[in-house]
Amino acid sequence: MSSHITLIKTNTNNENKMTQFNYKVDNDVMIIRAMVNNVAKQMTPVWPLEKFIACNALHGFESMSFEEAVIQNQTAKKGTPFNEKLERVNWHMIKWCGSFLDIGQGTLEMPHRDKGLYFGFLKLAPFDSALHQNSKSIKSWLSNLPEMPEQAIRLCLDKLGVLNQKQEDFLQSTLSHLPGWAGYIKWISEWKNRNGKEENPVSLVDFIAVRLVITCILWPEASQEEKKKKKDSADTKQLIQNIKNKEDDYRQLLLKKLLPELSKAHIKENRANAQMVFCIDVRSEPFRRCIEKLGHYETLGFAGFFGLPVSIKDYDGETIKDSCPVLLKPRFNIHEKAIAANEHCLEHHEKGKEFKNILNRVYQQLKYNFSTPFALVESLGIWCGITMFLKSCSPIFARRLTKDLNEMICPSIQTQPVFELDLLEKEVGISLQEQIAYAEMALRLMGLTDNFAKLVIFCGHGSSTQNNPYASALDCGACGGNQGGKNAQLLASILNKIIVRRALAENGINIPQDTLFYGAQHDTTTDEVEIYHSNVSQFIHQDILDQLRTDLNMAKHNNNLERINYLNSIDCAEKDIARRSTDWSETRPEWGLARNAAFIVAPRQLTKNINLEGRCFLHSYDWSQDKDGALLETILTAPMVVAQWINTQYLFSTIDNVAYGSGSKITHNVAGKIGVMQGNASDLMHGLPLQSVMSHDDKSFHEPQRLLTIVYAPREIISELVEKHDVLKTLFFNEWVHLVAIDPRSHLFYKLEKTNNWSVIQ
C-alpha cells in the first residue's frame, strides 16, 4: 500500500505550463519513521547550557530494572576499540551539527537552515571537498540523493548492505556514536518545540540521514564491522554491589537519626517572628539549620518555582525564560516593570543600558567576525591585559570595580513583576481567579495554612559564578535552570493583595492582617540572602525585618564555616567563598548538589534537630491535612521526579565521567553556545564536569547511590498513589528510587519492595 500526494502549480502567465511535485509517502518511509521513533526512546534529551537541566543519563532504559540498565550500558560502553573510519565519520558529523545548531557564536550562518538539517546538507555537501575528496562519482551520488530524509535512510541502508532484521539495531548504533549531539536534537524536537514551530527545524530522522550518507562515503563496510565481544560484567556487578552497600549504610544511618524524633511530642509553637520558605534543594538544608538557631524563626521546604508555571521577561533582558519545571508547560507570561525613585534615575538607567548594548554588539561582532579578532586584540590589548591581571590576582577587587563602573554608566533600579491580566495584551498576566487558585495551592502544598508569622519570606535561589558555562546547573532546577527569586517575588505580590486574602479566607485560609509577604533570593555560592521590597506597599515590622537581616548575615557566616570544610580551603571561610564566586579561573565555585541522597516528605519538626549534612531534599508535608492524598500525589509525581533526575545525573557522572559526564573543565570548549566539547571536535558533553563530583582525579566527593524517598504518611495512602501512576511504579518497582514510609501512628519504618509489598525495617 502506498499513497501519493500531488501538488499542481499553474503559472500566472498565459503559457499552459504546469509544475508537478510528486512526493511518494510509501510504506518504506513510514517504516523508517517508526524505526527512528523506536530507537529514539532510549536516547536521553540533552538540554542547552543556558537551561542545563539534570536528567537521568539512562532515562530511556527506566523500563528495565536499575541493575539491568547499568549492566547493559556499562558493558556496551567499555572496551570499544579505536576505529579510524568511525572517528572520521564522527568528525564530519560534528562539523555539520555544530554549523547547523549554532545559536550565535559562528560568524557566518549556515545556508538553508530554515529548511532543516538534511536539506541544508543536501545542498551544501557537494561543495565539501573534505568529504568527497573531489571524487566525481561521489559528488554525482551526493547531487542525486532523494529530498526526503527517510528515503535517504532507506537508500543508505541498502547501499551499506544492512539486513532487514538488523536495521533497527544499526540505527540504534548510529545514534549511540554521538549521544550528546543526538540527545540535543531530541531535546529540540520533543521539548523545545512543544511550544510551537522551530525556526530551524531538525529531527533525529535528519540526523540519521546525514550520518548514513557520510558513512556510505567514508565507511562503506560499517555494517560488516564485527561486534566486539561483550566484556565480562563482573566489574559492573561489583560497582552495583558497592552502590547497594553505600545505600544500605546511609539508610541505616538516616533512619537511626530520625527514630528519636518520632517519639518526641511535637507541640505547635507560638507565632514565629518570621517564616522562610526555601526551595527543597539540598543546599537549603544547612542554611535552614543555621537561621533557625538564631531566633524565633520557622522554615519550610517547597519547590523553588513556588507553584507558578510562568515565563518571565526580565526588564533589562531580551529573552523570555520559562521559570518552571521542564515537566510543566508555562501557562502565563510575566513581564517586569521598573520602579525608579524619579524620572531622572529611570532615564539615566535607560541611556546607560542602550550605551552598554551598543558596546556589547560592536564587541561581539568584532570578536566573532573572521577578519577582525586580531585587530580587536591590537586595539584593546592593553586594557584586556589590565583586566586579566586584576581578575587573576584580585578577583574580588576586579568584581567590585566592575560593579562600580556599571553603576556609574547604568545605575541599577528596582523592578517588580507585572502579573495583572492585561486586557489590551491578553497574553500577559494572570487573571484574579487564577491568582487565587495558584496562591491557595502553593500554601496548601507547603503546609502553610494557619499560624502565619508577621513576616513570610519566599526565598528562591540562584548562584553567582564567573566564566562558568555550567552556571545554570547551579541555579534552580524547579525554575528550569533559572534563578528563582522572581517567582518568589511574584507569589509574595499576589498574597499581599487584599482581594486575594479575602478569597483565601472563604476557602479556610485566614491570613492575619499584619502578615506581610516578601520575595527573596538565596545565593547558594556565597549564602547571601537578598530580600526584595518592591512587592510590599506598606512597611511594618521594621524591627523584625532589621533583626532578620542581621541574623541572615550571621547564618551566612556560620554556613560558610560548615561548607568550607568540604572545599579544602585554608583561607578565611567568607573570604575564600567570596573569591570563588568572582574568580574566573575557579573550576569549583561550589559543590552544587553533590552528595544528594534522600528526599524527605514530612513536617519540619521531624528533621529540625538533625544535621542532615546538606544531603537531603526537604519538602514540608502534613499528612493530617491531606486525607485524600491529593497533595502527596503532586509531591511524588513532580518534585520527587525532578529530584530523581538530579540524583541519577550525579550518580552516573560519578561512576563514569567519560561516558555520562563531561570530563574536566580545563579542556572544555563551548560549542555554538549550546553545549561543551572536549577539545575542538568531540561529542556534545551531556553530564556534569569532573570538578562537580570528584575531589581529586581518583577520589569522588559525591557518593553514588540511588535516591532514598522517605514519606511520613500511612502506607495505604502511598500505595494508592503508586498504583495510580505509571511513573511511580516504574521508579519504585524497577528500583531507580527506594521508598520508605514512616507510619505516623506506629512510628515503624516500612520499605516498598519491587514486588509491591511493604516490609518492616528493623
From Swiss-Prot:
Membrane-spanning intervals of the chain: none
Topological category with respect to the lipid bilayer: Peripheral membrane protein
Keywords: Cell inner membrane, Cell membrane, Membrane, Metal-binding, Transport, Zinc
Pfam families xref list: DabA
Transmembrane helix keyword on record: no
Binding site for Zn(2+): C279, D281, H461, C476
GO cellular component terms, semicolon-separated: plasma membrane
One example GO MF annotation: zinc ion binding
Subcellular location: Cell inner membrane
Superkingdom, taxonomy of origin: Bacteria
CC cofactor: Zn(2+)
InterPro entries: DabA (IPR018752)
Protein family (similarity comment): Belongs to the inorganic carbon transporter (TC 9.A.2) DabA family.
PANTHER family named among the record's database cross-references: INORGANIC CARBON TRANSPORTER SUBUNIT DABA-RELATED (PTHR38344:SF1), UPF0753 PROTEIN AQ_863 (PTHR38344)
Subunit and partners: Forms a complex with DabB.
Function summary: Part of an energy-coupled inorganic carbon pump.
Record's protein name: Probable inorganic carbon transporter subunit DabA
Organism: Legionella pneumophila (strain Paris)
